[in-house]
């Protein structure tokens, strides 16, 4: 089975609406630099199609997925890590106003399910049979659909919980496993006091990890109150990881804010991270699990 990375940007995409800084103006002048919000497309061994996250840029993500051989549309299932804008604002595209889908299994936490039930534009999709919520049990592997040939496991990860809780997801195939963790508040809260990042990934039996790389450092968003948008910076994460050593898992960063210099392949930051042996995730990358 295979996983396609359908987007690498933070919720607002790149370029971001309202940003007139050079970072986004460059992307407007050169559309090939643009990036879509984080999302995964998964093709099961039985040919079934599954998505993680439901972005409003789903049309472009479908085109990208189709270019590498997406199996079927609409997907058999969608899984949501949490409730924030860029991870859920495309749900309505499955409804009667656009695709007119039916019977899409929506995997999420019970906390996210409560929000679905209390949000009219989503609850009506449940009533109409467009989506069928299915609540996962944290840390318990499950098949998104019977016979798909892979499992998902939801890992609780602290992140702003004003709307719902937040989870990372482990996708486990016959050969390898991949951790998808676009959002977290801090490594201290995620790991606790005893584990390091590599120890944690080893305990989860993860071969590939796509992790929160929202900000390179907080200097890039000096006009914002960072307590309102907590994420560990990439520089902090690199300090905890050190240089990659033989036997370490494959770790790549995702969920880049539009200000993040890792969006520019020629930047010093991009070069520094690469020299340490870690990865900058590429939109359209395919992982065979």
Model-predicted segments: where are they?
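Short glycine-/acidic-enriched loop or helix-start segments at secondary-structure transitions
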Residues: 15, 61-63, 89-91, 117-118, ...
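Cap/insert and terminal regions of metallo-dependent hydrolase folds
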Residues: 177, 185-286
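A short, active-site helix/loop in glycosyltransferases that binds the activated sugar's phosphate group
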Residues: 110-121
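Active-site metal-binding motif and surrounding structural segment of the metallo-beta-lactamase
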Residues: 46-107, 207
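Active-site regions of enzymes building and remodeling cell-envelope glycoconjugates
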Residues: 132-134, 152, 275-280
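Core dinuclear metal-dependent hydrolase active-site scaffold
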Residues: 1-67, 135-196, 202, 285-289
């Amino acid at each position: 089975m295979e996983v396609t990375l359908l987007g690498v940007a933070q919720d607002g995409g790149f370029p971001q609406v309202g940003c007139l800084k050079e970072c986004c103006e460059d992307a407007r002048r050169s559309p090939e630099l643009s990036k879509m919000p984080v999302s995964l497309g998964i093709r099961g061994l039985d040919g079934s199609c599954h998505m993680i996250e439901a972005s409003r840029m789903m049309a472009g993500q479908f085109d990208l997925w189709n270019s590498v051989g997406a199996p079927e549309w609409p997907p058999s299932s969608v899984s949501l890590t949490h409730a924030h804008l860029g991870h859920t604002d495309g749900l309505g595209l499955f409804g009667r106003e656009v695709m007119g889908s039916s019977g899409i299994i929506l995997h999420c936490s019970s906390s996210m399910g409560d929000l679905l039930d209390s949000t009219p534009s989503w609850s009506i999709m449940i009533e109409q049979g467009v989506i069928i919520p299915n609540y996962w049990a944290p840390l318990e592997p499950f098949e998104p659909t019977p016979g798909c040939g892979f499992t998902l496991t939801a890992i609780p990860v602290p992140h702003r919980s004003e709307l719902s809780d937040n989870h990372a997801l482990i996708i486990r195939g016959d050969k390898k496993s991949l951790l998808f963790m676009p959002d977290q508040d801090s490594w201290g809260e995620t790991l606790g006091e005893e584990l390091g990042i590599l120890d944690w990934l080893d305990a989860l039996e993860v071969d590939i990890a796509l992790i929160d790389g929202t900000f390179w450092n907080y200097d890039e968003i000096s006009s914002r109150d960072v307590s309102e948008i907590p994420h560990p910076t990439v520089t902090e994460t690199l300090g905890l990881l050190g240089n990659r050593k033989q036997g370490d898992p494959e770790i790549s960063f995702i969920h880049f804010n539009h200000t993040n210099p890792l969006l520019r392949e020629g930047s010093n930051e991009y070069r520094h991270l690469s020299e340490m042996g870690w990865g900058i995730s590429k939109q359209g990358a395919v992982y065979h699990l």
